[in-house]
């Protein structure tokens, strides 16, 4: 590739990896570039990579690496860096997700609303997110392919693998959630096991304080319906050698340090300081910054409790850990015999005895196990002694074996706690495994880890290549000749038999005399010509392998020791004989063939190879998804991006390998619209009159003489380097055009300057001639003027002398006249002031006199009226006592008294028990109130005393002031007496001193008074609060008394001769139902409870006799007419719902509202609920909203309370009190005079009105929710402009030969049509405008929320052209709102504030000139800084190519967002939907117009019923009196 001057490139730099540069000079074999670090560098062309010249136009970053113009290392690196600076931590590379650890909390990305947004969304449709990958795996497993899936999470220590795994499991539980046993989900149980696994499997390394030293594969199992049915955890390659050997500054496993810091538990196991144990003191790092070992110990114990490990097993686990530590402190010295050993000293013997005690085994057997081994032969058992080194190795082998078995036991128990589904056929596995490792010193663990990563990389390469093939197939292009990049040769080098590195290592381990030198020699001899294996220069045993991520040098010093995993028979026999069931359970008895040999060799590498093989088989049977976690810096700080470290991780994570696979095929893919929009300037003649983008693309490529490109169905595929050729040609054309424009512009500027200079010279000449002429004329005019001036000066001097004389005379006269006038005016003013004072004083006297007379008159009138009222009250009482009705009732009650004795006795008992409990409560309240009242009285008395003192001091101060005034006046009057004057001065000084003392006392008194008043206010507040509680109790008590009064009336009016046996039970049920005892079941929110749920029904025998006397019960058999009215659509007459009017007329005629007990209201409510539950309920919702609201309006206006439910308190208690209060004053809501009769409402009627109100709210809520469901698909389409619209707008903006086409608003027209249809439906059903206004307002609020949230979640929507498209759609909604008027639309336009301001921000020009204050206050006042920051980070100008908000504003917003993130618990930038009911009962009463039901006739379909013939005989039925 040739480079020209001015071309933007990437140049490699040691510290930064890659830096931006610009070509300054291009030579034959070298290129001189000027880097962003202001350095001139001369490099060869092969070391340069092209950079996109338009990288800043799209916001400087893309959310998918495949969208990069140049897919190369620096492009990937800097794209991640720019997105990380904007807190965009997720980025796609095809189907691979790259997650950069933010090292800060971002809760808005992981709340439940965000999970709901990504549910069921195709991968890549929304912004990159780990939830998108999890949803893709779930959708393919459960919906599309019915095939198990796997998610591979990899990265180095501290990159966020574990947190990402938690988020994946959290999302999978959300979409396939199952409530597991003990009220814990599977995800919770797996996460609760994390602290336990971290304690026993994590340790501090050089790079990470909490590094996982094992691999983990979590398999979540699903049933056929997609619900989670179980889970399992598998672990790989625990770093056992860390138990016995660590290096500084690393640590051993966390559990050892936690146990040593456990306090009493540590003393119980005879543990001391960490530094006293050999397995822990090999490193000087004992504590972790920000971590308390003791606290972590108790967290681990709590995790064991959660997982289900018993207390006995917990004690055994920690005893085993303590025994391992004591085991490490056992030291050996040479014994008496050759090659033998024994315990060194008493300290070692103490640790030996302690370890044996903790293992619960024989100490002598432990000594013999450590210092010797037995060999079984035909002749017998031969015991061979071990030397010191062998005994220490035997000790370490025992410690590693015990710890490994303990770890496996923990994993097994965790799996048992979670629960596995063996019948599950669909699984989603989440692999959290260590990433590629390359340190200064790399040992056997790094070799195994990198071997596993090579295996996974091969699987990854195959998957990426497969994805490439699938895209090529979908685009129908030829791809058969593309080569596949494979790393099979590295895998053969490591694992191939019989001469692979692992095979050679196992062979060396089987020979006791083999060393790492013999192993290295044999390896170099077998692989001397292998391209991937190298021998290091300065070591005979170290070797280097060229992995996919780079070269790694391994030190073989400890390869053999770490690979040997002997199963020592003595170890198994020792611990299987332990008296502790837990320890003996870890070591089962060995088979016969194992007993014959003391050492049974087992290769760690071979076993890991088999585990890895099983894992790869599992992964191959699933469809993989990849998440690559990246650690941006080694300091674990937010907003710090280290290029070199990230680049190394990208290479190790296989991301750049995926880039290389893409480069092997067609790395550059562009849609035809994007390609034509970018490169149409190369062949402008093709743009004239042509709209076939594919043909234009082909013409451009053929014109540029490019080969090996492919034209797919929707995209053009270019080989590596071809896009650079096109960009160079495009840059040349644009440069030529720029030079041409500059030349024309310079010509224009030069001519303009020439014309301006010529006009200036002409102006200067004219000005000079004018100056000369004006100078000559001025001389002549001055000569003539001198004569005239002299004449006028002489005249002026004479005139001035005359005027001075006249002015002097006038001044003397005016002074004299003024003096006379002022003296006269002073006399008049004094006289007038005296008159005003006299008149004011007389008026004041008469006003005071009048007020006294008026108060006396009012008092007399009040007394007289009170006297008259008392007389009238006595008359009324006497008349009431003499009423015959009372005497008749008294006679009837006396006759029935004997029959009701038993029932009343029971009622008294129930009543007495309830009153007793209430009286006790009231007495308690009264005592509290009395005590507080006493305190209040004491405080008031104290305040009064202070106030009296204050008045006394004030009076003394006034007296002192009067004395001072008098003394001062005497001083003035007796100025001649000097001695008296001095005495008065002394007296004044003493009085002033006394005055100051009194003022100080007054200030102190005021302060104490203020304190007392504050305390008094606090006491009064408490007293008021208690008084309110007492009022509430009194209200409840009064309501219960009223209800009891109703029940008592019923009891008095019922014959009981034949029902005494069942009366006690019935009354108890009725009483419990009336006062709301716990027996009654709570109702759901949207159910409409019937009145009989509150009034318990009486026995059939009682109700039969009662029915014969109440009018409503005589008509109860005719409730079918009401059911017919409800089930049929009776339509409307003159805008009035016929069904509601007919139902109200029937209930009014049958006196249902005056009945104390009836079931007819139950039938009405239940019938309405049944209609709303039917199959056609959605279509009838507007009809029933109109009918129920009309019926509720009639009840509200025509029912009144009979005074039964009035309470003595000012405030009504509960819902019943509110209804009673409403019914007591129905005229409050009526704007006209009461022409309709008011009916006295009883308790069932009041409850019926309450249930009808709930029914109206239910219908409104169902209708609103249905509308939201219907409009949601339309909104999902409207948020983004159609592809054809975007392509045409782009071509119109950059191609001169093509005119712009108007944007298609068909999707928005669908929304307008939907709203028109909704308005027509609501108007056809005569729904009140109040409901229409509330419904439309909430619907537009939902539109605002959906459009705004979609805008923030989809980057392709945050463009200039898309903003214009959405703005045009919003203008259609504005026109619709204007057309329907405010009566129906209300504040709907205001509800669209968020989306209007966001779209307005997208389409403004010159965004870089806007400050943060202008954006917050002028452009987006309703939006939060987090929302504005989200829009700015996603915005890009796809139409004009302009830049977005300035970097200073973005940095300021990022700082504010980070600061808010630390303070807020939930700081999502998305909006929440409003599901509340936006009106109350009072709103309905005031908003719904009154209805005259008199002129509504009975429909013909109902006229044959006999029970409604009265509706045909009378037009306006009146209730019978």
UniProtKB/Swiss-Prot annotation:
Protein's cellular compartments: Cytoplasm
Domain Dilute: 1162-1459
GO cellular component assignments: actin cytoskeleton; cytoplasm; membrane; myosin complex
UniProt KW Repeat keyword: yes
Domain IQ: 733-755, 756-778, 781-803, 804-826, 829-851, 852-874
Keywords, comma-separated and alphabetical: Actin-binding, ATP-binding, Calmodulin-binding, Coiled coil, Cytoplasm, Motor protein, Myosin, Nucleotide-binding, Repeat
GO biological process assignments: actin filament organization; actin filament-based movement
Coiled-coil ranges from the UniProt annotation: 870-910, 974-1050
Expression across tissues: High expression in kernels and stems, intermediate in ears and leaves, and low in roots, silks and tassels.
Region (Actin-binding): 493-527, 529-552, 587-612, 612-634
Chain positions recorded as ATP binding sites: 155-162, 208-216
A single MF term (Gene Ontology): calmodulin binding
Family: Belongs to the TRAFAC class myosin-kinesin ATPase superfamily. Myosin family. Plant myosin class XI subfamily.
Binding partners and assembly: Interacts (via C-terminus) with HIP (via C-terminus), but not with zeins, FL1 or intrinsic proteins of protein bodies.
Entry's free-text remark on domains: IQ domain mediates interaction with calmodulin.
Protein name in the entry: Protein OPAQUE1
Lineage of origin: Eukaryota, Viridiplantae, Streptophyta, Embryophyta, Tracheophyta
Gene expressing this chain: O1
């Amino acid at each position: 590739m040739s480079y020209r001057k001015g071309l933007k490139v990437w140049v490699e730099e040691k510290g930064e990896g890659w830096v931006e540069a610009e070509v300054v000079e291009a030579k034959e074999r070298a290129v001189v570039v000027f880097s962003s670090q202001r350095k001139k560098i001369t490099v060869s062309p092969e070391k340069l990579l092209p950079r996109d010249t338009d990288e800043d136009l799209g916001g400087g970053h893309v959310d998918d690496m495949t969208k990069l113009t140049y897919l190369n290392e620096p492009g990937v690196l800097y794209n991640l860096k720019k997105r990380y600076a904007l807190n965009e931590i997720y980025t796609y590379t095809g189907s691979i997700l790259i997650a950069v650890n933010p090292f800060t909390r971002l809760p808005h990305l992981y709340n439940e609303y965000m999970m709901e947004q990504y549910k069921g969304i195709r991968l890549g449709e929304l912004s990159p997110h780990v939830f998108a990958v999890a949803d893709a795996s779930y959708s393919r497993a459960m919906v599309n392919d019915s095939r198990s899936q796997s998610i591979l999470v990899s990265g180095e220590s501290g990159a966020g693998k574990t947190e990402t795994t938690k988020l994946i499991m959290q999302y999978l539980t959300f979409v396939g959630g199952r409530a597991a046993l003990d009220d814990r989900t599977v995800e919770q149980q797996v996460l609760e096991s994390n602290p336990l696994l971290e304690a026993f499997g994590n340790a501090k390394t050089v790079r990470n304080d909490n590094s996982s030293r094992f691999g983990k594969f979590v398999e979540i199992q699903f049933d056929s319906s997609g619900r989670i049915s179980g889970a399992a955890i598998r672990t790989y390659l625990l770093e056992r050698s860390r138990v016995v050997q660590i290096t500084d500054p690393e640590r051993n496993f966390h559990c050892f340090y936690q146990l040593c810091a456990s306090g009493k538990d540590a003393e119980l196991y005879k543990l001391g300081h960490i530094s006293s144990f050999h397995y822990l003191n090999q490193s000087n790092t004992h504590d972790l910054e920000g971590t308390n070992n003791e606290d972590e110990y108790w967290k681990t114990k709590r995790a064991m409790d959660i997982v289900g490990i018993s207390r006995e097993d917990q004690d055994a686990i920690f005893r085993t850990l303590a025994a391992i530590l004591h085991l490490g402190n056992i030291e050996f010295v040479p014994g008496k015999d050759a090659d033998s050993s024994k315990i060194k000293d008493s300290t070692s013997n103490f640790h030996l005895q302690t370890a044996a005690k903790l293992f619960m085994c024989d100490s002598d057997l432990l000594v013999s196990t450590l210092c010797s081994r037995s060999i079984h032969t035909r002749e017998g058992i031969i015991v061979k002694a071990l030397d010191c080194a062998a005994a220490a190795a035997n000790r370490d082998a025992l410690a590693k074996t015990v710890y490994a078995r303990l770890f496996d036991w923990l994993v097994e128990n965790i799996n048992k706690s979670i629960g596995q589904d063996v019948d599950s056929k669909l699984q989603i596995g989440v692999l959290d495994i260590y990433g590629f490792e390359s340190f200064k010193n790399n040992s056997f663990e790094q070799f195994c880890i990198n071997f596993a990563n090579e295996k996974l990389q091969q699987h990854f390469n195959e998957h990426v290549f497969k994805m490439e093939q699938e895209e090529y197939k979908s685009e129908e292009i030829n791809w058969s000749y593309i080569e596949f990049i494979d790393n099979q040769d590295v895998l053969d080098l490591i694992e191939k038999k019989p001469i692979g590195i692992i095979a050679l290592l196992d062979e060396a381990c089987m020979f006791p005399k083999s060393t790492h030198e013999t192993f290295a020699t044999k390896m170099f001899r077998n692989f001397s010509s292998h391209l991937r294996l190298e021998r290091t220069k300065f070591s005979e045993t170290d070797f280097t392998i060229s992995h996919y991520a780079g070269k790694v040098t391994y030190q073989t010093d400890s390869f053999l020791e770490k690979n040997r995993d002997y199963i020592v028979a003595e170890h198994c026999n020792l611990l299987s004989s332990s008296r502790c069931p837990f320890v003996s359970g870890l070591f089962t008895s060995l088979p016969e063939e194992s007993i014959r040999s003391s050492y049974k060799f087992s290769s760690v590498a071979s076993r890991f190879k088999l585990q890895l093989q099983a894992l790869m088989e599992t992964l191959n049977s699933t469809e993989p998804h990849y998440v690559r976690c990246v650690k941006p810096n080694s300091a674990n700080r937010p907003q710090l991006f280290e290029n070199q470290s990230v680049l190394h991780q990208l290479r190790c994570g296989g991301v750049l390998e995926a880039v290389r696979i893409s480069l092997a095929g067609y790395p550059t893919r562009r849609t035809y619209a994007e390609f034509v929009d970018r490169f149409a300037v190369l062949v402008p003649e093709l743009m004239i009159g042509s709209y076939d983008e594919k043909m234009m693309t082909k013409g451009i490529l053929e014109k540029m003489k490019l080969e090996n490109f492919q034209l797919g169905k929707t995209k053009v595929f270019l080989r590596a380097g071809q896009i650079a050729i096109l960009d160079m040609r495009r840059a040349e054309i644009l440069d030529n055009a720029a030079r041409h424009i500059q030349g024309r512009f310079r010509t224009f500027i030069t001519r303009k300057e020439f014309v301006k200079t010529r006009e200036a010279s002409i102006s200067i000449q004219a000005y000079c001639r004018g100056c000369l002429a004006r100078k000559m004329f001025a001389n002549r005019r001055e000569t003539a003027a001198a004569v005239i001036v002299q004449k006028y000066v002489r005249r002026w001097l004479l005139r001035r002398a005359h005027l001075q004389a006249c002015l002097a005379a006038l001044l003397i006269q005016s002074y004299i006249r003024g003096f006379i006038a002022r003296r006269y005016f002073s006399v008049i003013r004094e006289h007038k002031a005296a008159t005003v004072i006299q008149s004011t004083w007389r008026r004041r006297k008469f006003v005071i006199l009048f007020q006294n007379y008026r108060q006396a008159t009012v008092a007399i009138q009040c007394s007289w009226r009170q006297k008259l009222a008392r007389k009238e009250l006595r008359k009324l009482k006497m008349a009431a006592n003499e009423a015959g009705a009372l005497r008749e009732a008294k006679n009837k009650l006396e006759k029935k008294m004997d029959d009701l004795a038993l029932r009343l006795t029971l009622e008294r008992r129930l009543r007495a028990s309830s009153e007793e409990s209430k009286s006790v409560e009231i007495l308690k309240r009264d005592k509290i109130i009395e005590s507080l009242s006493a305190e209040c009285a004491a405080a008031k008395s104290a305040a009064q005393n202070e106030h009296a003192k204050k008045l006394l001091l004030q009076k003394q101060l006034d007296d002192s002031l009067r004395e001072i005034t008098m003394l001062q006046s005497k001083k003035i009057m007796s100025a001649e007496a000097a001695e008296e004057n001095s005495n008065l001065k002394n007296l004044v000084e003493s009085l002033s001193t006394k005055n100051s003392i009194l003022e100080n006392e007054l200030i102190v008194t005021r302060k104490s008074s203020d304190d007392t008043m504050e305390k008094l206010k606090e006491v009064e507040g408490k007293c008021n609060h208690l008084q309110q509680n007492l009022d509430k109790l009194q209200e409840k008590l009064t309501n219960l008394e009223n209800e009891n009064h109703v029940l008592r009336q019923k009891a008095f009016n019922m014959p009981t001769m034949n029902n005494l046996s069942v009366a006690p039970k019935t009354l108890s049920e009725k009483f419990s139902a009336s006062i709301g005892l716990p027996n009654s079941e709570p109702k759901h929110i949207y159910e409409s409870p019937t009145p009989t749920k509150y009034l318990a029904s009486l026995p059939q025998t009682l109700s039969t006799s009662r029915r014969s006397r109440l009018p409503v019960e005589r008509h109860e058999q005719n409730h079918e007419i009401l059911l017919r009215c409800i089930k049929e659509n009776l339509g409307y007459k003159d805008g009035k719902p016929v069904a509601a009017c007919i139902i109200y007329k029937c209930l009014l005629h049958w006196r249902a509202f005056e009945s104390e007990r009836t079931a007819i209201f139950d039938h009405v409510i239940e019938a309405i609920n049944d209609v709303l539950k039917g199959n056609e309920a959605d279509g009838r919702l507007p009809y029933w909203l109109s009918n129920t609201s009309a019926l509720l309006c009639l009840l509200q206006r025509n029912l009144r309370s009979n005074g039964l439910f009035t309470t003595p308190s000012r405030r009504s208690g509960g819902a019943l009190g509110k209804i009673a209060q409403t019914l007591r004053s129905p005229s409050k809501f009526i704007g006209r005079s009461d022409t309709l009769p008011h009916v006295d409402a009883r308790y069932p009627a009041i409850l019926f009105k309450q249930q009808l109100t709930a029914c109206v709210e239910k219908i409104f809520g169902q209708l609103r929710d249905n509308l939201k469901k219907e409009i949601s698909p339309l909104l999902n389409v409207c948020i983004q402009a159609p592809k054809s619209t975007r392509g045409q707008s782009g071509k119109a903006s950059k191609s001169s030969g093509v005119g712009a086409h108007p944007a298609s608003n068909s999707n928005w027209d669908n929304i307008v049509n939907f709203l028109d249809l909704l308005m027509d439906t609501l108007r056809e059903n005569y729904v009140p405008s109040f409901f229409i206004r509330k419904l439309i307002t909430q619907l537009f609020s939902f539109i605002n929320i959906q459009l705004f949230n979609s805008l923030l979640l989809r980057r392709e929507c945050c463009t200039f052209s898309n903003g214009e498209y959405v703005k045009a759609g919003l203008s259609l909604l504005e026109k619709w709102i204007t057309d329907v008027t405010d009566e129906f639309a209300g504040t709907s336009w205001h509800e669209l504030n968020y989306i209007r301001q966001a779209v307005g921000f997208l389409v403004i020009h010159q965004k870089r000139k806007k400050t943060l204050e202008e954006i917050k206050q002028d452009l987006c006042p309703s939006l939060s800084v987090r929302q504005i920051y989200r829009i700015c980070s996603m915005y890009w100008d796809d139409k004009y190519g302009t830049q977005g908000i300035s970097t200073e504003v973005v940095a300021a917003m990022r700082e504010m967002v980070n600061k808010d993130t630390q303070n807020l618990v939930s700081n999502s930038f998305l909006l929440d939907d409003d599901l509340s009911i936006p009106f109350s009962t009072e709103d309905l009463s005031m908003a719904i117009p009154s209805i005259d039901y008199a002129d509504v006739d009975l429909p013909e379909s109902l006229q044959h019923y006999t029970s409604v013939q009265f509706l045909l005989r009378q037009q306006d039925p009146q209730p019978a009196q």
